[in-house]
Regions:
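Negatively charged
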Residues: 1-146
Length: 146
C-alpha cells in the first residue's frame, strides 16, 4: 500500500538541518500539509524525486523554515493543489525558489503564501501568466521565466 498522507511528517524537527527524501514514493500522496513546518534549522532538502501530481494540499508545507535559503521545487506539479495557504510563511531567509512547474487557478487558496518572505526573493516560473500571479502575491520584480 502506498502512503497518501504526509501531513506534519517532519514538523517541528527543530534540529534537522539536512534532509534527503529523494527515495520517497509520493505518487499517491494527496496531503503534504505542514510536512516540514517549523524545521527551523533545515537548510538543505532534496525533493528532486517528489511526484506531486495528486497532491491537493500543501498548506503550510514549509511554514517557519527559517534557515532555507534556496528551494528547488522545479518538479512540483501543482495542478491539483487547492490549498497553498501559508506554504512559505516565515521563510525569512528564502532568496531563491525554483517553482517552474507550478500552476495557480482561481480555486487555489493562497492566503499569506509568501508572507514574511524577503521581497528580493528570486523565483523561477514557467510563463507570463504565472509570473504575474506570483508578482502580485510577493510584490517582487525578481521573477524569471524558465
Amino acid at each position: 500500500k502506498k502512503v497518501t498522507d504526509m501531513n506534519s511528517m517532519f514538523s517541528n524537527c527543530y534540529s534537522l538541518s539536512n534532509l534527503d527524501v529523494s527515495n520517497f514514493h509520493t505518487t499517491k500522496v494527496v496531503d503534504m500539509s505542514y510536512m516540514f513546518s517549523s524545521c527551523i534549522k533545515l537548510s538543505n532538502i532534496n525533493l528532486s524525486s517528489f511526484n506531486t501530481s495528486k497532491v491537493k494540499t500543501m498548506h503550510g508545507m514549509f511554514f517557519n523554515c527559517k534557515s532555507l535559503k534556496s528551494l528547488n521545487l522545479s518538479n512540483f506539479d501543482t495542478s491539483k493543489v487547492i490549498d497553498m495557504n501559508y506554504m512559505f510563511l516565515k521563510c525569512g531567509n528564502l532568496d531563491n525558489l525554483d517553482f517552474r512547474k507550478a500552476t495557480f487557478n482561481k480555486e487555489t487558496k493562497h492566503i499569506a503564501i509568501f508572507s514574511k518572505v524577503p521581497s528580493n526573493i528570486t523565483i523561477i516560473t514557467k510563463n507570463e501568466k504565472t509570473k504575474n500571479w506570483l508578482k502580485d502575491k510577493i510584490k517582487s520584480d525578481n521573477i524569471t521565466i524558465a
